[in-house]
Amino acid sequence: MSQPKRGRSSQAQNHLITILLALVIAGLSMWFGAGRDGGNAPDAAATPVPGSGLTVTYLDVGQGDCTLLQCDGQTMLIDAGIGEQANHITTYLKQQGVKSIDYLVCTHAHADHCGGMKAVIAAFPVHTLYSSVTSSSNGAFQRVMRAAETANLTITVPGVGNTFALGGATVTVLGPQKHYSDVNDQSLILRVDYGSNAFLFTGDAEYQSETDVLDAGENVRCDVIKAGHHGSRTSTGYRLLYEAQPKYAVISCGAGNEYGHPHDDTLSRLRDADVTVYRTDLNGTVVCRSDGTNLSFTTEKEG
């Protein structure tokens, strides 16, 4: 009778050991699978850690242009409105924590785009100054030239196809494709890519320059387009909209401006292309934020 008793005891002990081993293995699996912080280690490793994102601010400077781009601690300012807006621009930049400007871009030598640049150069250290020209008879641009000389800045004309990094974003020069006698068509045309999002800036480029960029096969696809020449009927043509396929457009113009910007023809084309439009004359300053996938817009006031 003693042998059966020993057998039942041995079976019970083996069963208990099996249960304990299973519990230990399960516990170890949970520990190493979840990680010490309780997160899911495989998913966390597969998800890239985002940077600070890209913020694009279309500043309301009346009848002019000024766009601030901030990405991962770096800053680019495209144009700087008219001279009368200089204090507004420099004050806004300081409010946004801007200490220096990595790239200052003058799309072309017209006062409503470069009028405030003299003050910007005086107020902030500028690392690189890009422009579509190095000299001009335009008085506002001549003041930019003198300010650049005082700051020991070289005005550089970037070539088509040139790229440079703005934090995690990439800026590509798409135009002008050649030299134009028309100052508007001489505008720098830039595409800014951040993750899967893209922004297109055309300055005051008109149909001829737009057509040459498209004929050259440049990639103009974008989520957000800044309408050319303040919404003039001579810019942001159907072909550009077809190739770019933007979801949003921002028009920078002054309320009740003497030019009638934005023109009805332009607004009609944007409607036909099913583009959501923001206007600085109606919405004030427009801010677009990108995390590399999603876009969000905030405006200073309701349109």
What is each residue range found by the language model?
Residues S2-G303:
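Non-globular, low-confidence helical/coil segments that flank catalytic cores
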